[in-house]
Structures are given as C-alpha cells and as structure tokens.
Amino acid sequence: MKIVSFTGPKGSGKDTSADILKKEGIADGSISFAGPLKKICQEVFGLHHTLVHDPVLKEKPLKDGEIIITPKLLRKINQIMLDYLDPEEFYYNPNKASVIGLEGVPLRTPREILQVIGTEWIRNRIHPDWHLQAAFSTKALSSLNEDGLYCVTDARFANEYQFLATKFGADFKGFYVERPQAEEQLAQATHDSERKVLEVKAIIPAENIILNDGSLEDLKKKLLGLGLKGNEPTTKTKKGQSKFKFAKAGKYDEGSF
C-alpha cells in the first residue's frame, strides 16, 4: 500500500487534490485520521454524517443548542474508543485522564465537538497517537487494496506526518498544499488543529510544496506532474524497499514516487 498525504490550512485544496487523484484513477480512495473520531462523535452526540463532513455545516450551531461536557459523556467516549483498536497492537489506559478544565465546557457546533473531543480530550489527555492507531489498525486496513494508493488529507500534526513516514517508509510521500488566501486565514487561526500544520510544513521538503494559486485545471496539471502512480506491484520485494513501481516525475521524483 502506498500513502500520499496532503497537508495545508483549511481551504488550501487538500481534499480537492485527493479528489483529483481519485478521479484520474491514480488513488483508490482516502484514509482519514479523523475517521474514527467522527464516527464516535456521530454516535455519542447524535450527529448526522453530513454535520461532521461538510465544511459549511460543521460551522452551523447545533440544532438543539449547546452540549455541556460531563464526566459521564467522556467515559462513554473512552469506552467506544477501545473498540477501534486491537489491544495486541496498541494499548493505553483511558482511566488516567483528568476531566479538570473540560467539565462544563459548552460545545456549540460540530466543529467545536470535533476539535475539543479530538484534541483537548483524546489527543492531549488520553493518548496523542490513538487516532493514528485507530485509522491504520490491521482491522481498519483489512478491507482496502493492499496494492493501492490512498490519500490522507488531515495530517495536521508533526507526529501524524512522522507516523506515516515511519509506517510506510518508501511507500509514503507527503505534500503541503499552499494557497495564498488560506495562508492568510491561517495567520488568524487559534486552535492547535489548524495552527500546527506549520510544523508539518517545516519538515516537508521544499520541492513537495504545491502552490495552488491558479485554477482547478492548473492544480490538476501540477498533481499529474508529480508522477504518482498506484496499482503496480512489483514481483520481488527486498526489505526496506518499496514494493511498487513508480513513474518518473522531474524535480518531484525522489526515487520513491
């Protein structure tokens, strides 16, 4: 399996880039670090699928008003979190987390729910790697094409990028999508899940920064020029080497993709 990640601020073109690769038959699909979190929030808070995926609806006030965080609610989340992991692959103790500072906090929009539960609770108090392990567990990957290429568009933190680089080695390629308007908005962002993309940008090679300052067709040409190509497993694989063939792609080609 090959993984291509697109990092960047909100509105930079990450999901659009992944959609282009899928429409062109290069990528088989997407894997989301936030996928398990969104499913949990749908179950616990009764959110419709569209409310946790649509970028506009995420910002809308909750239909029934604000939701107040309680210890009981957080314990319920903890219990469901365990269902997404294989304890032989990854284990943590969810009962050590403190609710101090979160109890009584109001959640007013789907985005606030995802940010507070995903970052303030799970990432900062339970385990920073839970969502990584949940999204890429053996169980989660079992239904995917092992010879396919998949896109990740929500690697917002440095440890997420490093996780992909370590887990997939030569079968991983990370890009930062830069769009002028989005970079301006990023300067005003206050939440870690938005600001931390700059730390990822700092470790991505300069040649892997995609400037998305033109039309959709311009972005498409740049993406197709990267030489990304999936679904071509080689017949022999040596330890530490990629098991895929890769297309040549000028300055973007570093021998891996």
Where are each of the predicted segments found?
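ATP-dependent small-molecule kinase phosphotransfer cores
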Residues: 35-146
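ATP-binding Walker
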Residues: 12
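Walker A/P-loop
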Residues: 15
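Hydrophobic anchor at the beta1->P-loop junction of P-loop NTPases
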Residues: 6
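P-loop (Walker A) phosphate-binding loop of NTP-binding proteins
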Residues: 9
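Small-molecule kinase domains that catalyze NTP-dependent phosphoryl transfer to phosphate-bearing small molecules
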Residues: 129, 134-140, 163-166, 171-247, ...
